Amino acid sequence: MIFYNRVINKGQLKKLISWSFNNYGTAITAQMANKLKDLGFRYATKAGVSISVDDLQVPPSKRQLLDEAEQEIRNTTERYTKGKITEVERFQKVIDTWNSTSENLKNEVVRNFRSTDPLNSVYMMAFSGARGNISQVRQLVGMRGLMADPQGEIIDLPIKTNFREGLTVTEYIISSYGARKGLVDTALRTADSGYLTRRLVDVSQDVIVREADCGTKRGVMVTSMKDGDRVLIPVKDRLLGRVLADDVKDPKTGEIVTQGHIQAVKNQVLTEDLAKAIGKAGVENVFVRSPLTCESPRSVCQTCYGWSLAHGHMVDMGEAIGIIAAQSIGEPGTQLTMRTFHTGGVFTGEVARQFVASFGGVVKYPSNVRTRSFRTRHGDEAMIAENNFDMIILGVDGRKETIPIAQGSILMVQNNQQVSAGIVLAEVPKVGQVRKTTEKVTKEVASDLAGELKFAQLVQEEKVDKQGTTTRIAQRGGLIWILEGEVYNLPPGAEAMVKNGTRININSVLAETKLVTEHGGVIRISSSPLYSPEKQNETNVLAQATQESTIDELEASMTGTSAQLPINTEMPDNLPREIEVITASVRLDQAKVRLESISNREQYIIETQNDQRFALKVTPGSKVGNHEVIAELLDENYQTSTGGIIKYAGVEVLKRGKAKQGYEVVKGGTLLWIPEECHEVNKDISLLLVEDGQYVEAGTEIVKDIFCQSNGVTEVHQKNDILREVVIKPGKLHSGNYEIDLGDLTLMDGQIATPGEEVIPGLVTSELKYIEYIETPEGPGLLLRPVTEFHVPDEPGVPSQKSINSSIELRAVQRIPFKDGERVKSVEGIELLRTQLVLEIGEEAPQLAADIELLPDLEEEGIMRLQLVILESLVIRRDVVADTTQGSTSTRLLVKDGDVIEAGGVVSRTQILSKKSGEVRGIREGSEAIRRILIVREADLVKIPVNTLPSVVEGDLLVAGTEIAPGIVIPRSGLVSKVEETVLNDGSKGYQVILRKGRPYRVSTGAVLLTMDGDLVQRGDILVLLVFERTKTGDIIQGLPRIEELLEARKPKESCILVKYPGQAQVNVNDDNVEVSVVSSDGTITDYPLGHGQNVIVADGQNVNVGEALTDGPQNPHEILETFFNYYREHESAYEACLRSFEACQRFLVNQVQAVYQSQGIDISDKHIEVIVRQMTAKVRIDDGGDTTMLPGELIELRQVEQVNEAMSITGGATAQYTPMLLGITKASLNTDSFISAASFQETTRVLTEAAIEGKSDWLRGLKENVIIGRLIPAGTGFNAYEDALSAEINRLEQNWDDDLDIFEEGDLQSVVLDDQTARSLEFENSLNLSSANQNFVDSQGKPQSQSSFIDDSMSEFSPVKDKSGSVLDDSDFPPGNFDSDFPADNYDLEHEIDLEDDVYDGYDDFDENTPDLI
């Protein structure tokens, strides 16, 4: 073995260990790894590698790269301010410029390290794969680059510094956006990933290897997985450990591919060597067995699964491959990013290949070139090639270069144009590139200055959508000009006092507003807070002045906020904040209000002149509406001592009363009250101490711990042995000795007997009684119950009141809380009649609310009067000094306190004054209210003197840098407002151009216009929404959410349209709409109507196949399944159509899930995903049960349905019709055969209820259901599916047993892992020792082996070890011990080399750049 003089990095270490493991087994590899570790540590302790600040070398060319980028951006900004490009194009250009700068700087960093300091510790760490990657090194010594904001949009201000130089404050804050996002992301990811794993385990836990070979002829075709040109997973990697379903033939020779003595024939397991041989032979499609097509019922067979990736041998029987698959997919979940990046349309460098001129010269196109003009995403004019041709560059020195241009390429140069070296000539789209779908997005353009709008070359059109809203759209692109001026916002209702063209000075009145009262009334100027003692005198004076007392509400919380900006207000300081107009008021002039303490609660009591006492029910200072209760009479006269029955005698109430408020009395009369005591108990019947119908004395214990308060007869209510209530009815019981029919007694029940009436012969009443028939323990009887009478007057007394307007008054109302005949259950007394004071507001203003005010009395101290007022509050503008967009204001009050004002009267007037002198513009004549006024000031004009007649006329719009006369260019963009003659100093005639400053904004076609020609705008107003298309990156929904979307089989929001029948696509493009149809080979035409915003991605005349996408957007797996099923169903049986449509859907799901993991650089074997997808596509939905027992809508396994259908066709019955179903993992888990497993997952009650109703049985086939009920799981050692077959085999072995046979022949032993304590007692004849580094790969004389090397350039694979005679050695020649010096190296020849070359470092393309916070 020879010495291998090369740096061994991470990848090569992996290969070394893998080689050792495959060829020499576990024990030796473990020892070798141990020795390698010791070696590593030995050298690590001799020299340490650390990073110091000095190791971070910033490339010297950084400054120059940044300067170039900044210059480019300055040029772009200048083009933008001149209106040459739109805001979107500017943004795009800036982002692209910084992206390429960052990329160039990264290359520069690597070049700098390589050329100046290859032993730099940062460089060694990152590039050996020990720690860190190029992306992180770039942030340390390059520049951090562009970052995204919290919404995922890119901020066009890059971080130009790196961590070595330190970040500025701004950069630090931009940086922290991404960091915070990262933290939040990680926290969410862990939970999401865990839940995903749980669902996956649940759906696949019952997949166990139960048989050796299912014997299926089906399989799947394995190809390389690609993204555009880039191969993500080559075929050889996807084949490892699979079993071939068909022979693999070399495409060149047509012979079966062979590696060593192994042939790639059907049922052969693909080892690493064989897979590599197939890859080398250039075979692109290999037909292999797969869990997807395995025909084992409820499991997967060994052959379809292939190797167990844990040990690289065929999977064992009873292996729980479902759980392994679930964990393999779920575990890397935390490494997937969840964040979606809206890059604002940033293109990656992969989209197109650029051709750059390598030398200066002239561009020549052939004569047959067809091109059309095109505007690039940076706003440059270019052309698109419509056919293929060769572009030729002829150099000055006779050099010639030919560049092949493909159809669809963007040409940046014209024919015969002179170009210099380094100029981009063309961008050629990559062939077979992944469809980049686009989406329409809008970007707002805000005005940078205030002024007047003018549209130039802009053609508008109005569109009305289904809802009837009108949008104005730019039919042809153009410019929106803003001509500078000072714009004043006017408050609502302001009236302009000037006209267009008026010259005004500082403080001229521009407009005025009036404050008007709506209802009219008495003016009250609000200035005092509630109950302030120092304001007492003012209030008293005011009270006398307006014949009523007043007290202010609390300071109005409303301050004049309205739609316009605040005003600079010039106001006398004594101007009130608000003015109140009293529209109506009512006052209780004779009643006194006192604050009393009633049962530990403070309450306002109103005492009227006729000694009635009312309790105030509302708080002072609050507002009350029409018909609300203000106060309630405190009256003991209608109080009872217990509950009872109420009956009306002559009393009439309003029918529409609400029981909650009580029934309003319309006509007085008498209320009859029959008292009774009612105890609600709700206890066990055993606690009852009296009988039903028993007569008890007051104080008797009727139920444990409950005593009655009056004498009477008991009535017990019970239900289901629960005692509900006990009623004690007072009265006199008459029973037994009256000669009267029992029937007559019952007729008297519920009647009232008047005094002197004979109830039954011999029984005369002396007072009013209520008769009740009752059953007592002694027999039937009559109970004469006492009746109390309460008199109700027709009208209650109303306190005296004074009002200044008859539209508001207080009315006294009597209300009875119970209806006629109602039984009131109570032990305590209740109130039978309430007298309330209610507010009545007249017809004129029932919607207004009144304020409750308590006013101090002028004569008596400590006494207050109650007053209700209806106020209209008018807020006087007194806004703080705010914005320069406002003129200053002056406000004048036109009323005094106590004035009476008519409805519609003016209370105050506010004038808006100008701050600068100038000319008034922009007032629109017509009906619409004027909201803004523009003043053109001197500062908005530029005067340019010229000697000769200028080449411009009044009204021209010019951009900065335009020549207006020979040698004279204008410094600013703007509008020529005047060209006038002047006299120069020498007396000759000259000219003066007066330019009104302005600024153009470019508007692209299709933009939504939010302003109109001639509008006045303030700085920051949105002028227009630019509509543009940006590419959606393939994974706009990235990482975990995408995996979840696929495995839960969710329908994407806007999916693409799929081809239903193969044929030729026809695309017709009209002005606005695109029509797509497909013509099949038999001439049928299928139309495909496009949805809103869908873009066609097929060309006219292109051949399309079934299931292919016609438009952009994500594919819907349910639609794929349905499309293929409907297509195959026309030609094949339902079963075959089902299998083939499932196959298409499975292929889509496996590849999509793989793509997400690959985009994050995570490798997962296909077979794991296939096991999960198999579970998702196992069931079909029954459409028609035929003669079977299956019901429509049932979900049943396809295999099961097919067995039933086969039986039906034999017996001649009608078969079941079905449709394939794709179930998400959650749904599949809930639809498993085992209800125990499903119930333990989700919706436990529903699953168990359904199982009970259907009488289901659980056959305990999976792991979960066995774990739940505590049995041995049917996997691993508990695997018992083929017990019979196994026991038969054991019997056969026992019969053929030979005691003398030594089955452990020497040489048969594999290298065994000795992990028990007995290993030390075993003796090995010769032991291997890997220790001494110098003897690792040399022979005993120390000479390198001549015949082969540890590594050579052919770099095949590690191959078998031979001795000098050429015979291959097996593992027994290497006893598992130490590689000691007595290892006879001389005899052995390592012909097997380690394939390390693939991984030798060749640049840094393979370093991960997807760090989460960078783009």
Swiss-Prot record:
It catalyses: RNA(n) + a ribonucleoside 5'-triphosphate = RNA(n+1) + diphosphate. Residues 1335-1390 are annotated as: Disordered. Its EC number is 2.7.7.6. One of its GO terms (molecular function) is DNA binding. One of its GO terms (biological process) is DNA-templated transcription. Disulfide bonds: none annotated. Residues 1335-1351 have a biased composition (Polar residues). Its cofactor is Zn(2+). Signal peptide: none annotated. Zn(2+) binds at C214, C294, C301, C304. Keywords: DNA-directed RNA polymerase, Metal-binding, Nucleotidyltransferase, Transcription, Transferase, Zinc. It holds the Pfam family RNA_pol_Rpb1_4. GO terms for cellular component: DNA-directed RNA polymerase complex. Binds 1 Zn(2+) ion per subunit. HAMAP family: RNApol_bact_RpoC2. Belongs to the RNA polymerase beta' chain family. RpoC2 subfamily. This is DNA-directed RNA polymerase subunit beta'. It comes from Trichodesmium erythraeum (strain IMS101). The lineage of its organism: Bacteria, Bacillati, Cyanobacteriota, Cyanophyceae, Oscillatoriophycideae. The gene is rpoC2.
